[in-house]
Amino acid sequence: MKIAFAALALGAFAITASSSTSATADEPFEGRVVAEAKLDAAGKKATIVLKGKDASTYINKDYPAKCSVSIAEGGKLEKAELKKEDGKYEDAGKEGKAKSLTFTVGADKSITGECKIVACSDSSCSSPFKVTFKSN
């Protein structure tokens, strides 16, 4: 009987411990990441920057971030789908985390779109979510 009780208690502890060290966070990350897009003055390319609103929010470098981009009517867009490999990360000095992720795409008119990413704090990461952007 003591062995059965000990096994039950140990099992309950293991379940509790594993749920508290989950890789995804209970804290909301969606409002802590911004996406900024800007068309250059020459009207030849657009830059999209994804970053945390504060220094404690990071972009997860291990998640395959991707963006869907559309251009204003009559405009020319170099690429409508951007992947992680198309971007450049600004390293945060923490394994798997970046301060920002920047994409550059050829565009001659304003762009809009959304990016699917994972954000992290020092202790946890979000589930994948989308952020939207619109350039000048």
What residues fall within each predicted segment?
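Bacterial Sec-dependent N-terminal signal peptides
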Residues: 2-3
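Bacterial N-terminal signal peptides
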Residues: 6-16
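Boundary at the C-terminal end of the N-terminal hydrophobic targeting segment
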Residues: 17-25
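Extracellular/lumen-exposed scaffold segments
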Residues: 24-136
